Amino acid sequence: MIKNRKKKSYTSVYALGQYISMSAHKARRVIDQIRGRSYEEALMILELMPYRGCYPIFKLVYSAAANASHNKGFKETNLVISKAEVNQGNTVKKLKPRARGRSYPIKRSTCHITIVLEDISFYQQYEEYLMYLKKPGCSNENRNLTCHDTYSSGGLWDKK
């Protein structure tokens, strides 16, 4: 059996909440509202939504941001929720006592929630570098990101 290994990502951080006492369907309803949004916007949305499932998801997003700032040194203003998924967990089965010695089964569903935050400043720096390479007079050989055009005084031609 071949297992897919996770690639090491230098721009993303995740937080995983397991066995959260809520149905996966209700959690997905909240997760769909925050997927693709920035960290601060997602926190605002989660605080104002009137669902019971918002609080555990709020704690997960907050925990993922704490992981990002502590472990990788990312700024919270540059974080975006790139991936948010909800998987169904175990179903806890209980018995509710009823009249005449009978009992009714109660099924308590759980879910596993994964929140992945990504730092967008890395992509902005990459786009700036690509825009720099498209400028006339700049070539890919200049690794130190300094551009010398032919009309400027000094530069490479003054050195002998």
Curated annotation (Swiss-Prot):
The keyword Ribosomal protein appears for this protein: yes
Any Pfam family the entry gives: Ribosomal_L22
SUPFAM superfamilies: Ribosomal protein L22
MF term (GO), any: structural constituent of ribosome
Keyword Kinase: no
GO biological process: translation
GO cellular component: a single term: large ribosomal subunit
Coiled-coil ranges per UniProt: none
Keywords: Chloroplast, Plastid, Ribonucleoprotein, Ribosomal protein, RNA-binding, rRNA-binding
Compartment list: Plastid, Chloroplast
Entry function: This protein binds specifically to 23S rRNA. The globular domain of the protein is located near the polypeptide exit tunnel on the outside of the subunit, while an extended beta-hairpin is found that lines the wall of the exit tunnel in the center of the 70S ribosome.
Family per record: Belongs to the universal ribosomal protein uL22 family.
Subunit structure: Part of the 50S ribosomal subunit.
The protein's name in its UniProt record: Large ribosomal subunit protein uL22c
Species whose genome carries this gene: Nasturtium officinale
